[in-house]
Structures are given as C-alpha cells and as structure tokens.
Amino acid sequence: MQKLIERLDFGKIKARGEMPHFLEFQLNSYEDFLQTNMSPNKREEKGFELAFKEIFPIESSNGDVRLEYIGYELHEAEAPLNDELECKKRGKTYSNSLKVRLRLINKKMGNEIQESLVYFGEVPKMTDRATFIINGAERVVVSQLHRSPGVSFSKEVNTQTGKDLFSGKIIPYKGTWLEFETDKNDFLSVKIDRKKKVLATVFLKAVDFFKDNNEIRDYFLEVKELKLKALYKKYSKEPEELLNVLKQELDGSIVKEDILDEETGEFIAEAEAFINEEVINKLIENKVDKISYWYVGPESKLVANTLMNDTTLTEDEAVVEVFKKLRPGDQVTVDSARSLIRQMFFNPQRYDLEPVGRYKMNKRLKLDVPEEQISLTKEDVLGTIKYVIELNNGEQNVHTDDIDNLSNRRIRGVGELLLMQIKTGLAKMNKMVREKMTTQDIETVTPQSLLNTRPLNALIQDFFGSGQLSQFMDQSNPLAELTHKRRISALGPGGLSRERAGFEVRDVHDSHYGRICPIETPEGPNIGLIGSLATYAKINKYGFIETPYVKVENGVALVDDVRYLAADEEDGLFIAQADTKLDKNNKLQGLVVCRYGHEIVEIEPERVNYMDVSPKQVVSVSAGLIPFLEHDDANRALMGSNMQRQAVPLLKSEAPFIGTGLERKVAVDSGAVVTTKVSGKVTYVDGKKIIIEDKDKKEHIYRLLNYERSNQSMCLHQTPLVDLGDKVKAGDIIADGPATKLGDLSLGRNILMGFMPWEGYNYEDAILISDRLRKDDVFTSIHIEEYEIDARTTKLGDEEITREIPNVSESALRNLDENGVIMIGSEVGPGDILVGKTAPKGETEPPAEEKLLRAIFGEKARDVRDTSLTMPHGSKGVVVDILELSRENGDELKAGVNKSIRVLVAEKRKITVGDKMSGRHGNKGVVSRVLPAEDMPFLEDGTHLDVVLNPLGVPSRMNIGQVLEVHLGMAMRTLNGGTCIATPVFDGATEEQVKDYLEKQGYPRTGKVTLYDGRTGEKFDNKVTVGIMYMLKLHHLVEDKMHARAIGPYSLVTQQPLGGKAQFGGQRLGEMEVWALEAYGASNILQEMLTVKSDDITGRTKTYEAIIKGEAMPESDLPESFKVLLKEFQALALDIELCDEEDNVINVDEEIGIEETPTEYSPQYEIEMTGLHEIDEDAEDFEE
C-alpha cells in the first residue's frame, strides 16, 4: 500500500472537539425529509410524512367518501437506472418511485373500505456525495438563508417630528404578517399584510380577544378607586389645594362607572369619559363620596389614546371594520367577515408559525406556549403589544432587534426547500380530489381514479430541474464541489433579490463568527448575499447555525465540555480566543481578551464563560486551505479562496509542501478519494475496481472512475493506492481521485519561482514561465468534451446514421467504422466528421421519362443531404468513448428520436501564453511568455527558475502570506528530500520559525539569494527572493476563448455577422471604431467595413467572386441595415422613399434572387456564400 502524506504540523493549539463532516447538513436534511431508513409505520411527523398527514384525510363535501393516508414507500428504480453512472450516461434522473398506501371509505356503499398502493411519481435520490442526478446532469441544491419566523421589534425616527416610532412584527412561516406600530399622534395601530392599517384595539376585538373596550381597558390600564370624603375633610379650608390634589391624581384618567346625582338622577360623570378640570369641579360640587377609574399614566397613554379614537364598540362592529380594510368594495356580512379573519389567523393550513417561529416567539416574549401550537394565540398578540408599549415608554430591559443578526436568520436545507414545493403540489392535488369526489360515480370510485398526481410531479421536476436554488454542480475540482454544497444563499424564492439588497445585509456581522465565513463570498453583484459555512459550524433542528465553544468555569477551561451555541445563546457571554494561554491545569492566565457582542474586552479569567475550540472555526473550508492567511489582506484572501475553486485538476498532481492540515479532510469528505467502508483484505485490484473481503469472507466492490467527464469538462479519474493482499481498516483511503495525491487535496504544483522584473514580461501581473513546464507536463491537464447527435424521424423520412455521405472524400471518412461512427482512439481536429448522418431532401414529382427509367433500372438512391456531426472550429483531441442509445435496443429516447450518439473527445492542454495562473493568496496573472529553460534566471547550483513574478504585485496588494509561503517552501524543498508541512490558519509558523528553517537548510535568513541571468550568465545586481510557491492553473484557458472567423452565419434581419464564439461570430465594428476610421479619413476602408464585409448581400457575393477570379472589386450595393432603417421609419408612420439621381423610386423590398440551396458554394474552400442557413424544419421535435 502506498504511504499517505504525513504533514509536519506547526500548529500550537490542540483542537478541542471534532470537526463535523463537511456534507453533514446536506445529507441529514434530505434524510430527515424522506426518512428512507425508517419503516413506513414508524416514521416521525416531519418532511414527507408531515406533508401527507396535513393533507389527508380528504373528505367529500357531503361526507360520503373519505380518503385516508396510511403510509408511503420508496422503491428503487429497476436496473440499469439504479446506478448513478448509468443515469448520467443515459441522461436520466437517479430517483426512487414513491408509492402511497391509501384507504378509501365509501359510506354510500355501507362503509366499504378499499386499500391500495398508489404510484405518486419519482422522487430524486441523493447520492452519498450530497448531489442529485437530474436528466443526466449532476446538480446541487444550495441552502437558503432567510428571515426567521417569530417576532421582531424595530425603531424608526419620524422625519417631521423627530419622534421615535416603534413597531413589532409577527412573521409567520406562512400566512399574513402582523405589524403593531406607534405613530406620531400616539396611536397604536396594526398593519395587516404590510399594507392594510387599522387601530390595534379594533383588531383585538375583531379576533375576539376582548368583547368590548372596557375589557381592553381592564387589561392594559390600572383600575383605581379614590375615596373623596377624607380629602374633603383634610382640605376643607383650602379649596384651591383640594382641586390641585385631585387634578394630580385624576387628570387624564377615565371614569369606570356612571356617577349620578342621587337626588336628581342627572349624570355628574359618564362612564368611559376622560376626567378633566370640569369633571373634577362637578365631583367637588356634588360632594361625590368615591370614584372608581382607569388610571392613565405615561405608560398607558398609548392604549387610552387609541381607544378614544376607536369608534367600534362591539366585536361585530370591529369585525366589519377590519373586513372593509382587507376587502374594500366587497359585500360585507358579520359572519363572512368573522370567517375570513378566523381563517386568516387561526387556521393552521393558512397561518403557520412552524416550531421555529413558536420557539422564537416564546423566547423573545418570555412565553410558555406549547411548541405544537403553531397558529396565533392571544398571548402572542398581547405580548407583542405590551413590548411595543414598553419600547415606546423607554423602559430599560427592552431592546429592538438587529435584523442581520444570525439569531434572526435561519437556514433552509434541501429537505425543507423541497417540502415547501411538495406542500404546494399536495394542496393543488387535494383541491382536484375534492372536485372529483363530487363529480365521479360513487359506486365505482377508487383511490387511483380520484388522484391526479401531475401537479405534484411537475413541481418536484421544476424544483430540481429549473429552481433558482438547484444549480448545475461546479465540478472543476473536489474543493469546488465541496464548497458548492456548503454554500448559503440569501437569494431564491422567499429570499432577497440582488436589486433590493442593501449594504447592511451584505456586510459581515459579529454573529457570523464561527458560523459564516467572513472571507469567502463572490466578487460582483452577489457579494455578501452568498456565503459559505464555517468549518466547525453545524445547523440545529430549528435551522439556526451553531458554533462550538469550550465551557469555562471559575477561570478553568473544561476542555472536554464542548457546547454548540446558536447566535442568540451567545448574547451577554464573554468568549475567549482559542489561543488564550492555559497552565497545565487548564486555568486561564492573566487578563483575557474576549469577545462580548461586537466589542473586544479584556477581563479577569473568572468572568470568562466560554472559549473558542480552534482558530480555524472562523473561516470556511476554502479560506482554511490558504497557508499564512493571517498575513493576507481580506480582499486578496477572498480572491484566493475563490480561485482555488477554479483550479484545473492536472495530469500529474502534487500535494503542496506548505499546506494547512485541511487537505486530507477535504479530499475525503468531498468524495474525491475512495475510502473503504469495511476492514479486511484486498483480494483484487486494477484500474477499474478494487475488491475487499471482510472478516466474514463477504466481498465489497469499489468501482473506480475511468476518464469520466465532469460538469466542467474536466477529467475524473481514480487511481488505486493499495496492492493485492494489503490489509485495510474501515475509513482507509484506497484510491486517489482527480486533484488529489496520496490522500491529500492537490490543486496545483510546487514551483521554483523568484520575485524580480524580467524585461517587462511581468508588467501588470503577467507571469513569465519556463518551457520546462510545457516539456515535463507540469501544468498539463486533460479536458473531455462531449458531442451529441440525434437521428430523428422527419416529415420527409428518417434520418440515417451512415458512412455513405454525399460529396465527401474518402480521406474524410478514414476514421469512421462501417456504421459511420468514429472509432475510439482516433485523433480528430476541426471540421472532422465524428458521426456521419444524412437527412432526406424534399423530393419533387419526377417527370414521366424518369419514372420509366426508374421502373426499368430499379429505384435510384433518394436525394439526401449531409447533416453529419463534425468537430467545431478550434477543437481537437482523441476520441475516448462513444455512447450509443437506440430505440431498437429498447432505450428510452425523446419523441421523434430513433438513435442518439454521444462522442467523448479528450484533449491534453499544456500551459500556454494567455492562460490564467494564480497562487493561493489572490495573486493571479496571465502567462505572457514561455521562455526556453536555459534563458531563465538560475541559482548558484545551476537550477533554473520555473516562474518569474513581479515583486510590485506584493506591497500594494498586502498579501504577504505568499512571501512567507515562498521562504518556508524553499526550506522544506530540501528538508529530508522534500517535506510536507501544515501551517494552520491563525496558528501557523511564525516569522522566526521560517527564518530558523531557512538557516538550518543553509539559506540566508533573509531568504534572498544571488541569481544569474540565463542569457548572459552574469549576476543580477541585487539578491532576489527565491522559493517554492504552490501555483494553480485556472479554468480560464486561452484555448476556450481564442476565436477567428472568415465567413460564417449572418443575422436574419440585419444580415450582419453574428457575435461571439458560440455563434462563430465576427468582431463588431461599433460607432467608436467608425469614428477612428473617420479620424484617419480612411473612406474606402470604412466603406468596405460597412458594406461588403458586413451586410451588403449582393456586394459580398460579388466580392467573393471577384477575389476568386482575380478581378477588380465591384461597387458596393445597399447595406441590409439601411433597409431595416427605412422599415423603422415606416413603422413610425413616416412615408419615406429611396430615389436615384433621376428621382425614380427604388423598390427596396425586391427580393434578392438567392436560391434556397446556394449554388455559389465551394466545397473545396468549405465556404458558404449566403447568409441563408437552412434550418432543419422537418424535425418534428422543436422542444430543445
């Protein structure tokens, strides 16, 4: 067995607690949704099971028929579609059949019971790499970060008055939003669904929390009783003082009960009236004994004011008032209004907080409503109103919420995203079933006849096939795959949109610490909206991201007590860094630097609550692979982590000398390498498979990938690392994959490089390389392209795959087999035929004499045209595989397709001028020149450098990590014949250690050495920093971008050449280019450019003729775009005509006489003279 790479670790902090599996969340989310490993009757109420239980039982409106749900089963697809690779090859979906067991109870037929298993459709199956194979393509469903349901409070300042206005939003998972808010007039109102506004007290009566206004006052205001007799006595001599005392006590309060004059029966004060000076004077005059009232203090003014403006007195009036706001213009009755409001807030089908919303609500308002209660309760509403009132009163123990805090944002995984779709589909199905129950004949009804599962299947297919969060997997290399699955997007359905997202949402937040990486996010319009999960982060059952900490008690770190905390559990805690110094008893020493909210404080050890588990926990996998990350500017680190994902797997991979210790875990968790599931002995090994026999003599077969094509046309190939007879343990690595070497992720190569200018060839980040990198295939990669052709049935007959192609020389067919398909191993170049195909031409009725001749000499071969599959321009390679699918062999193909052939062509690409390369620190550049190795600068021992980079690329970019990497790489290159090390992020090798290792290996401590010019052999004036840098070749290869056109397709209307490489287009000569030619007065060139080289149809045909015959150039005709301009004038209803010198009208609309199949076609030049490209209109199936 080959020995795996062992790294010398420079990390000083021992990690406490295990790093979770990098794909844990994706795999668990889908398993929780499907519960495949549970038997149907033992499944928990979550995911699919929950969705079915919410919809069933379905009962007909008259109660005669009832459809009940028993359970669902998942059945594996039949061979060969139960294999991932086969699904990919055949363009099929890797899925399970969903069958649901239902019970139909028919009361009309004397409670007759029918049980049956109904096929509901296909549910895609997740591979163990957390991907889905949909129509042959591997896809990933990205997790979504969205606003958590629950309640949140916010503050705004009124611009006119400068007054603070507060609001409390109750946000359900699904249903109507409620927002209680104060306004400048001190009223408390509620917005229903963010637009319809009513007074809060009206709403409270409408939802039947209170019967009338008095009940509301009893709840919010304090009831007091004042005995006046004693006061009359006390202030009998001082009537002024009496008035002041009563004013102070009663002014602004509300009378609770009517106060009558006992003799006359007249009202002294009416119930529900505000008490003012006039009322107080009446009380004194009439010597009223006592008064009971609702006390209105500053804290209850809001409710009292609102009630004063509330014109509704009863629940019925309130219900009607709310209904009028919700449905203005609709006919209103009390019952219909009440029913609408009940449905809106108290029907779990329409209003659903979900357990997470209930959890947040209970936590925020300090309630203890049971978690099963997912609709709105009285406690929720009153708690929210009370909190808004407390905020308005400026109380100490209340605060508004930060919407960008991760305690208010949660993750929806694959399972939950799919569940949302499925609930929608089932709801549609439910509606259809109810309709069918009323229309179908009750005597013959069966579960199958009632169900129409099409809407459900359409939604599942939509979600996986074209949903915003289901993405074509980035398969450039194992790291790209892994980070794609760990990506977190704030976009997508129910999320933000790029245009609406402001700066705050995108910014790094203190709650991201250890949860979302502050570095890895795309550059461009999505910055900050798409993030990546941090290395140690997990996601809890409510969807909040948690990060692990070590518990600290009385200044001692309990290193075995690792706890995962969500963002809201971290509030008010002092959390120390992972590198805090501990003594041998794990006691914290000295003053400790801690995080406290978004502040950094220094405190005594006894006050510390928790401590980080590892310095790595802050960053994502991609950023965690950058050595000396702590010495790089964040902007460059962002580029570095994004560019590692674009690295092309090389033909000869090599693990980095300077790693971070994450390389092995990435290789294993991404599924790039093959690990064994059992312990045992290797009994068979070759390039295609490895067989391991366990202790019970049972054989386990591990198939290896052989030159498979990835989504990004990279080559997926696995190589065994074990030999026959080797003993292996479960979890051992037995085969290397693409971009891995001996079990470690290996995206690039260790390159000897120097920082120096060289003849201007590294100006502006350009890279000068040695031709050794080409000769020794150092940066050579294999790319596999796929070319596909279908033979269809057309109106004129069947297309045929054949070797007999009209007007094609024998040499062009030399590599085709007898069926017209290219042979594996053939070398092909641009224009070569891969698959010969002919299509029938439209045939006219032959004349009588031809019919006679045909009758005598037999049927003449029908006229066919060549529609073969050829290699596109600029492509070359070797045919490595051919996949044939045909109806004859029983393969499923699209409608109208009889045979489908796919040809895989592999191409070796060496590094070349124009290719993009980079290091791991965001130091990217383009190869500017490939220099012969002997001309490159060389060291004193004669070793030539491989790469020369510009030293000016370092200081302004502030990514000094690359310099440290180069120095340490130089030392490790010669240590024990090449040593791989790990320098973990934020805990790596120090500057001193780097210098010590350089010295140990006989290099100066500065890391600078004398270099000699390879051309003259002379010393360079100054010493140069030379060392080993790990460099990557990126996916932006010049061969994919280079493009040239002579004659090609034209746009139909303007007749100008198309644009872009994909369309084989030309270079656009825009208005600025015209100005440039005008500035030179180059009138003839300008005329050619605008006519015969572009859209003058007759002119370009005649010009070609003139060139062929060697004649003088003809004059140009009218450009087609001029005619388009005339048409545009006419479309504006302007009558515009074109006249010649004699004022004769020129008819622009005259058709130019071009035949359908151009005769001016010269096969030997492979040039088509006209812009009329025939479209294959005979093909029936235009869906593609």
Curated annotation (Swiss-Prot):
Protein family according to the UniProt entry: Belongs to the RNA polymerase beta chain family.
The organism of origin for this protein: Fusobacterium nucleatum subsp. nucleatum (strain ATCC 25586 / DSM 15643 / BCRC 10681 / CIP 101130 / JCM 8532 / KCTC 2640 / LMG 13131 / VPI 4355)
Subunit structure: The RNAP catalytic core consists of 2 alpha, 1 beta, 1 beta' and 1 omega subunit. When a sigma factor is associated with the core the holoenzyme is formed, which can initiate transcription.
GO cellular component, one term: DNA-directed RNA polymerase complex
Key words, A-Z: DNA-directed RNA polymerase, Nucleotidyltransferase, Transcription, Transferase
Transferase found in the keyword field: yes
Pfam families (alphabetical): RNA_pol_Rpb2_1, RNA_pol_Rpb2_2, RNA_pol_Rpb2_3, RNA_pol_Rpb2_45, RNA_pol_Rpb2_6, RNA_pol_Rpb2_7
Enzyme Commission number: 2.7.7.6
Enzyme class, UniProt record, top EC level: transferase
Protein name: DNA-directed RNA polymerase subunit beta
Nucleotidyltransferase keyword on record: yes
Catalytic activity: RNA(n) + a ribonucleoside 5'-triphosphate = RNA(n+1) + diphosphate
Record's function text: DNA-dependent RNA polymerase catalyzes the transcription of DNA into RNA using the four ribonucleoside triphosphates as substrates.
Origin superkingdom: Bacteria
CDD domains according to UniProt: M23_peptidase, RNA_pol_B_RPB2
PROSITE patterns from the UniProt entry: RNA_POL_BETA (PS01166)
GO annotation terms (biological process): DNA-templated transcription
